[in-house]
């Protein structure tokens, strides 16, 4: 794994160098420095799970055959395209949410001299994906499918973000709009497609597969993405911020979180009143009341039960798949996220 990570980081250096020398733009020393700093901070700064999982998935689809140097480079490059996509989403997401930290560091727009320039940086990150795809995949038989895939997933994610933002619109804080169904829709589109389906879809295309023949794989991965986001919602409230690498703000931000939806299902009339009065307010005393209510309603227990049921359901779906190679890909994904702490 350490070896794969160092190979993966070497490919990042190649891709970054390509972009810093892009012939379509005359860079000044200052603009090249800005771009390099922005890329290192936002693209390279994450856990790299999504990107690395393209390489892992492709290896598993090759069923133990060693990858050629070219296959290794291309699978890493596709992994980095997903990391670029993630960086683009997060840079803009943090501005929209007015977040403070990301990955244990100040959000990019909070850095001195960055501010709203971060919006243009987000646009650049989005454009880089297609420059990488064009440079390294243009001659591949699956190039058009790759471009379509990235466009489709970006569109789905932006629509998920839209539902999230309009559901949690600041001027209309109405908890009655929140339900498990709305939560699922937001998560499916905003997180599951790009975080879970996209890495495996990239590996399948590289392996010469037609994605239309793998809708069952998409279904399992979307379900896995929903489980992952429910974990995220749980950790936002119950995990230690040091371990998590960020300060959870779902309560303050009036997020349509799995916890608040479950709380609404379990609340008495009196408890509902407490939730309505305190949810979505930034004062520490309001946040503390919501957290105390979550404890009272035993949402930790509800989450443990949900986690167990999800794991069993996903395992059953995976084991029903006819391809052992695809089973291995899906099992490796599930193993990475089951009972995670951050």
Curated annotation (Swiss-Prot):
A GO BP annotation: cholesterol biosynthetic process
UniProt cofactor(s): Mg(2+)
Residues engaged in binding Mg(2+) 2: 93, 97
Keyword check for Secreted: no
Reactions listed under catalytic activity: isopentenyl diphosphate + dimethylallyl diphosphate = (2E)-geranyl diphosphate + diphosphate; isopentenyl diphosphate + (2E)-geranyl diphosphate = (2E,6E)-farnesyl diphosphate + diphosphate
CDD domains cross-referenced by the UniProt entry: Trans_IPPS_HT
Pathway given in the UniProt record: Isoprenoid biosynthesis; farnesyl diphosphate biosynthesis; farnesyl diphosphate from geranyl diphosphate and isopentenyl diphosphate: step 1/1; Isoprenoid biosynthesis; geranyl diphosphate biosynthesis; geranyl diphosphate from dimethylallyl diphosphate and isopentenyl diphosphate: step 1/1
Disulfide bonds: none
Cellular location(s): Cytoplasm
Keywords: Cholesterol biosynthesis, Cholesterol metabolism, Cytoplasm, Isoprene biosynthesis, Lipid biosynthesis, Lipid metabolism, Magnesium, Metal-binding, Steroid biosynthesis, Steroid metabolism, Sterol biosynthesis, Sterol metabolism, Transferase
Pfam family, one: polyprenyl_synt
SUPFAM superfamilies in UniProt: Terpenoid synthases (SSF48576)
Cellular component per GO, a single term: cytoplasm
Enzyme Commission number(s): 2.5.1.10, 2.5.1.1
GO MF terms held by the record: (2E,6E)-farnesyl diphosphate synthase activity; dimethylallyltranstransferase activity; metal ion binding
Entry annotated with the keyword Membrane: no
Record note on cofactor: Binds 2 Mg(2+) ions per subunit.
Binding-site residues for Mg(2+) 1, renumbered to this chain: 93, 97
Binding site for dimethylallyl diphosphate: 102, 190-191, 229, 246, 255
Residues engaged in binding isopentenyl diphosphate: 47, 50, 86, 103
Function description: Catalyzes the sequential condensation of isopentenyl pyrophosphate with the allylic pyrophosphates, dimethylallyl pyrophosphate, and then with the resultant geranylpyrophosphate to the ultimate product farnesyl pyrophosphate.
Entry similarity comment: Belongs to the FPP/GGPP synthase family.
Protein name: Farnesyl pyrophosphate synthase 2
The species this protein was found in: Arabidopsis thaliana
């Amino acid at each position: 794994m350490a070896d794969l990570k160092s190979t993966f980081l070497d490919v990042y250096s190649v891709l970054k160098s390509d972009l810093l020398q892009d012939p379509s733009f005359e860079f000044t020393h200052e603009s090249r420095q800005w771009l390099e700093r922005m890329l290192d901070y936002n693209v390279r700064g994450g856990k790299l799970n999504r990107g690395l999982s393209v390489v892992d998935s492709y290896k598993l689809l090759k069923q133990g055959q060693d990858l050629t140097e070219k296959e290794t480079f291309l699978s890493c490059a596709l992994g980095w395209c997903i990391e670029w996509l993630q960086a683009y989403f997060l840079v803009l997401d943090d501005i929209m949410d007015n977040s403070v930290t990301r990955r244990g560091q100040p959000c990019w727009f909070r850095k001195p001299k960055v501010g709203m320039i971060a919006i243009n940086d987000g646009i650049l990150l989005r454009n880089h994906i297609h420059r990488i795809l064009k440079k390294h995949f243009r001659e591949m038989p699956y190039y058009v499918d790759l471009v379509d895939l990235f466009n489709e997933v970006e569109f789905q994610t932006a629509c998920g973000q839209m539902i999230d933002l309009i559901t949690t619109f600041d001027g209309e804080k109405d908890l009655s709009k929140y339900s498990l169904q709305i939560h699922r829709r937001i998560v499916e589109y905003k997180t599951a497609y790009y975080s879970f389906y996209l890495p495996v879809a990239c590996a399948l295309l590289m392996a010469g597969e037609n994605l239309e023949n793998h809708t069952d794989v998409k279904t399992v991965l979307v379900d896995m993405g929903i489980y992952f986001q429910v974990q995220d919602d749980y950790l936002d409230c119950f995990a230690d911020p040091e371990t998590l690498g960020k300060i959870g703000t779902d309560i303050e931000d009036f997020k349509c979180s799995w916890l608040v939806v479950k709380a609404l299902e379990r609340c008495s009339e009196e408890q509902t009143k407490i939730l309505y009065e305190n949810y979505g307010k930034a004062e520490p005393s309001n946040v503390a009341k919501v957290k105390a209510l979550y404890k009272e309603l035993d949402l930790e227990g509800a989450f443990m039960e949900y986690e167990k049921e999800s794991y069993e359901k996903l395992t059953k779906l995976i084991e029903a798949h006819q391809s052992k190679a695809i089973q291995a890909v899906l099992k490796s994904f599930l193993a990475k996220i089951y009972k995670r702490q951050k």
